């Protein structure tokens, strides 16, 4: 069985841990507890192939900027996450997460993930955003960011409803098993 290491990064509170817990246990966690570092594992079948998917959760908070890259060596695929209802977390994909990941692992594939899809249609959330003259991130904006950061795919999901959730991890596995033609170079991740 092939083992794949998938590291999940993104701002604090965008839903990285919920994404992983909902996927691995089919249950949505209740309260928010900031992650320092966690590991999950799932045996899955993708396209008829058994895979052991090692899922590495990371802390998005700036306090952990020096610690986080310790989880990057030998990463096969990254999920860079942002919340669809947090424009700041979307901007940080460009200014923080892509630069960090591409610095440490320049040829490792990236899946860009918009989280909290269920809240994009939530009236209360929309009102809070519009009070601050903000709007949720629309699908075309996600596609634009995918191009900018050279991500293999852009996907949206909800850990709460599980809509699009399995697809995120299936596509992460496919990015490793069937790499895009342009990424034929040997994947290596160095810690400098």
From Swiss-Prot:
Keyword set includes Iron: no
List the propeptide region positions.
190-192
How would you summarize where this protein is expressed among tissues? Highly expressed in respiratory tubes and coelomocytes. Moderate expression in intestinal tissue and body wall. Low expression in tube feet and longitudinal muscle.
Q: List residues, modification Cysteine methyl ester.
A: 189
Give the signal peptide range: none
InterPro entries listed in its UniProt record: P-loop_NTPase (IPR027417), Small_GTP-bd (IPR005225), Small_GTPase (IPR001806), Small_GTPase_Rho (IPR003578)
Keywords of this entry: Cell membrane, GTP-binding, Lipoprotein, Membrane, Methylation, Nucleotide-binding, Prenylation
UniProt keyword annotation of DNA-binding present:
no
Main localization of the protein described in the UniProt heading: membrane
Q: What induces it?
A: By infection with the Gram-negative bacterium V.splendidus. Following infection, expression is significantly increased at 4 hours (approximately 15-fold above control), then decreases to control levels at 8 hours. Expression increases 2-fold above control 12 hours post infection and remains constant till 48 hours post expression. By 72 hours, expression returns to control levels.
Q: Where is the lipid attached (S-geranylgeranyl cysteine)?
A: 189
Cite the binding residues for GTP. 13-18, 30-35, 116-118, 159-160
Q: What does this protein do?
A: Plasma membrane-associated small GTPase which cycles between active GTP-bound and inactive GDP-bound states.
Spell out the family assignment given in the record's similarity comment: Belongs to the small GTPase superfamily. Rho family.
Listed name of the protein: Ras-related protein Rac1
What gene codes for this chain? RAC1
């Amino acid at each position: 069985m092939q083992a794949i290491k998938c590291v999940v990064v993104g701002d604090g509170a965008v839903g990285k841990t919920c994404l992983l817990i909902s996927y691995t246990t089919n249950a949505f966690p209740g309260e928010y507890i900031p992650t320092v570092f966690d590991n999950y594992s799932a045996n899955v079948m993708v396209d008829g192939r058994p895979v052991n998917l090692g899922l590495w959760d990371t802390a998005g908070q700036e306090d952990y900027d020096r610690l986080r890259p310790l989880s990057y060596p030998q990463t096969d695929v990254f999920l860079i996450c942002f919340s669809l209802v947090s424009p700041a977390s979307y901007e940080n994909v460009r200014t923080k997460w892509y630069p960090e990941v591409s610095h440490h692992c320049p040829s490792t594939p990236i899946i860009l993930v918009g989280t909290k899809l269920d809240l994009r249609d939530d009236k209360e959330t929309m009102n809070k955003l519009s009070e601050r003259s903000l709007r949720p991130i629309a699908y075309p904006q996600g596609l634009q960011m995918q191009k900018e950061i050279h991500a293999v795919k852009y996907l949206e999901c909800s850990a709460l409803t599980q809509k699009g959730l399995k697809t995120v991890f299936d596509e992460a596995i496919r990015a490793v098993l069937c790499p895009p033609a342009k990424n034929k170079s040997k994947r290596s991740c160095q810690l400098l």
